[in-house]
A protein has these predicted regions:
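Short, well-ordered amphipathic alpha-helices
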Residues: 24-34, 64-68, 95-96, 117-118
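Beta/alpha (TIM)-barrel catalytic core signal, keyed to glycine-rich beta->alpha loops juxtaposed to Asp/Glu
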Residues: 83-181
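Short, acidic/polar
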Residues: 1-6, 55-71, 88-90, 115-119, ...
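Glycine-centered flexible beta-alpha turn that most often forms the glycine-rich phosphate-binding loop
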Residues: 13, 76, 107
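Active-site acidic short loop of glycosyltransferases
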Residues: 7, 40, 73-74, 104, ...
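A short, structured active-site edge motif that brings together acidic residues
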Residues: 39-53, 77-84, 111
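CE4/NodB-like, metal-dependent polysaccharide N-deacetylase domain
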Residues: 59-80, 97-101
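N-terminal binding-site loop/beta-alpha segment at the start of enzyme catalytic domains
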Residues: 1-43, 61, 161
Length: 181
């Protein structure tokens, strides 16, 4: 559970509208604060706008508002477009407005391929601060990293150890690195 994760020291919590757990995340955050485990400011909470809310700016605004309401939070530390689908340019305008209003402290994208990210960054008013992508020792994505570097977009890895598909704990090279550090 999220509350137990906070109890053990986790401070970054990643959720999304499509995960259908924003309400549970918000509840765990409120419980952790009530128990004196942390302050809201000590946590970094990310959520994501799903594609059904990316048809236009109005739907994206409603999606952001719904995420905030479900979670019971006043703001998200980071809010992402979950994928480059739908009218993600119009949806981005809603993120820009919420960022400027302070309800989204940082805004970014997720799963944007290098050519999509490049076109996006050349077009939008506020560049994404993060691109959350699959990134791990078995899928290094050098072209994606180069595009992010060029546009000053911070990469954030999902499945940073390979998502369990690659058995990284049995990988001799990774075990050697772990043992050395």
């Amino acid at each position: 559970s999220v509350l137990n994760a906070i109890r053990t020291g986790y401070r970054l919590i990643d959720t999304a509208a499509v995960y259908d757990n924003e309400d549970a995340v918000g509840e765990a955050v409120r419980e952790a604060i009530a128990e004196g485990l942390c302050t809201r400011e000590a946590l970094f909470i990310t959520s994501k706008l799903w594609v059904q809310d990316m048809a236009n700016t109005g739907m994206a605004k409603a999606g952001i508002a719904a995420s905030l309401k479900k979670s019971g939070l006043e703001y998200f530390d980071l809010y992402l477009l979950h994928q480059a689908m739908g009218d993600y340019f119009s949806a981005w305008r809603a993120l820009e407005e919420a960022y400027e209003a302070g309800t989204l402290k940082a805004i970014g994208v997720s799963n944007f391929y290098p050519h999509v990210l490049a076109n996006f960054c050349e077009t939008v008013r506020i560049k994404p601060m993060v691109n959350q992508v699959e990134l791990h020792p078995y899928f290094a994505q050098p072209a994606a990293l180069e595009a992010m570097k060029h546009y000053h977009v911070q990469p954030e890895a999902w499945a940073p150890l390979g998502g369990g598909r690659h058995n990284p704990y049995q990988d001799a090279l990774l075990r050697g690195i772990a043992d050395a550090h």
